[in-house]
């Protein structure tokens, strides 16, 4: 599901009921809402006929209900109920990384994807052939997770989120982030970091830990779902990098996660420090904070996540200094920094390197805006000269 909850951004399952009748299992790559937002609805639709298992990693199982319940609290258009959430969870079968599950002669294996805690690529093997769906994937690695495993396959279904962009290095991203925090807080301002509750939030905690020595004592405020989702990370410390584990064990961060005091947003906006709030596209609580700090040049908003076109985060990142929102007009006088190095997605150079190593017979490009996906297609054609490269439309079937 999209960050918006209307029209074409909603799932179109009812239009594809004939295709859904043959579904034997649902495999989930990770717990971000654009990948699992409609799963309770899908389970309800499939349940009219039979019980279909949902395969995912244990961390994904633990994170999904947090995302669903938040959706139910804030959406204006419900496609499922809290009862559907409970029924969907009953269908979940946790699968370990590299553990294979057989479904009617097909072997399914989940492979680390490096995108966020519990994220997985899906390897499907049948009749001597291998298909891999990367899901959202990070071949470079991040502050919190090791790089994605590179899986050989005859058919690769790969994301194209950054098919037309390259990221700065992690080292550069951390250094720039530290410089922004140090300068803004040093002048008595507030640094707002809008994050996705799962993935980017924990990256920023790790970045803060890495630059803490330079910052000194800086007040830290955590809002939105970040606290609840980060608590899940503590259950799976063995899946995290050493740097991320050390960050989560830092009392400066862990005290805020487990024992953070409750302040009004107005109080925090008048203080100085770092505010980490959902959502990453400057929606929800983060937008409320932004309304309060945007008019003061001493403050800063640091954009560290993908921004869907037309979202407030996208408009601000493109230099818009006047936002017309349902709740009123916001004049943007604060500092705006865009840091791409914290991304949980591979950029085109990493994906091209992977495709060149694997050299699949078929490459299917998905999960990208039109400009990004066709830029990725053009680049992939230069690397996979003998391969069939497809960009399917919504609802379009492909014969392999």
Name each model-derived stretch.
Residues 324-353:
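Generic long, charged, amphipathic alpha-helical segments
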Residues 180-304, 309, 366:
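Hard-cation-handling environments
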Residues 125-127, 148-150, 207-213, 237-238, ...:
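Short, solvent-exposed amphipathic alpha-helical segments in soluble enzyme
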Residues 374-397:
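Short acidic, glycine/proline-enriched helix-loop-strand junctions
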Residues 137, 169-173, 251-264, 279-282, ...:
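A general structural motif
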Residues 355, 359-365:
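Proline-aspartate-enriched helix->loop->beta-strand connector
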Residues 1-27, 32-36, 40-215, 219-221:
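His/Asp/Glu-rich metal-coordinating catalytic cores
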Residues 295-334:
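Redox- and metal-dependent alpha/beta enzyme cores, enriched for Fe-S-associated oxidoreductases
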């Amino acid at each position: 599901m999209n960050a918006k909850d209307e029209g074409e951004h909603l799932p179109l399952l009812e239009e594809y009921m004939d295709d859904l009748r043959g579904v034997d299992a649902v495999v989930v790559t990770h717990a971000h809402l654009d990948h699992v937002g409609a799963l309770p609805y899908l389970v309800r639709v499939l349940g009219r006929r039979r019980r279909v298992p949902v395969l995912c990693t244990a961390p994904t199982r633990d994170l999904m209900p947090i995302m669903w319940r938040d959706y139910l609290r804030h959406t204006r258009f419900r496609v499922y109920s809290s009862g559907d959430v409970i029924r969907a969870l009953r269908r979940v079968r946790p699968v370990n990384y590299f553990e294979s599950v057989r479904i009617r002669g097909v072997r399914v294996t989940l492979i680390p994807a490096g995108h966020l805690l519990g994220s997985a690529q899906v390897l499907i093997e049948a009749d001597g052939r291998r298909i891999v769906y990367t899901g959202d994937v990070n071949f470079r690695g991040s502050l919190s997770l090791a790089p994605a495993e590179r899986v050989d396959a005859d058919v690769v279904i790969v994301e194209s989120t950054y098919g037309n962009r390259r990221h700065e290095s992690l080292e550069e991203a951390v250094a720039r982030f530290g410089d922004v925090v140090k300068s803004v807080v040093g002048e008595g301002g507030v640094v707002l970091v809008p994050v996705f509750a799962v993935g980017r939030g924990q990256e920023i905690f790790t970045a803060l830990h890495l630059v803490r020595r330079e910052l000194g004592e800086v007040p830290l405020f955590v809002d939105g779902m970040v606290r609840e989702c980060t608590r899940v990370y503590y259950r799976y410390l063995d899946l995290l990098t050493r740097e991320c584990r050390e960050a989560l064990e830092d009392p400066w961060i862990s005290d805020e996660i487990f024992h953070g005091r409750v302040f009004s947003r107005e109080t925090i906006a008048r203080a100085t420090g770092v505010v980490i709030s959902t959502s990453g596209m400057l929606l929800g609580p983060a937008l409320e904070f932004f309304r309060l700090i945007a008019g003061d040049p001493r403050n800063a908003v640091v954009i560290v996540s993908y921004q869907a076109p037309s979202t407030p985060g996208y408009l601000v990142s493109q230099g818009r200094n006047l936002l017309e929102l349902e709740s009123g007009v916001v004049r943007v006088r604060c500092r705006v920094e865009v840091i791409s190095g914290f991304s949980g997605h591979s950029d085109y150079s990493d994906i091209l390197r992977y495709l060149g190593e694997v050299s699949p017979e078929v490459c299917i490009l998905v999960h990208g805006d039109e400009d990004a996906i066709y830029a990725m297609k053009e680049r992939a054609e230069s690397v996979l000269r003998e391969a069939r490269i497809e960009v399917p439309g919504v609802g379009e079937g492909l014969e392999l």
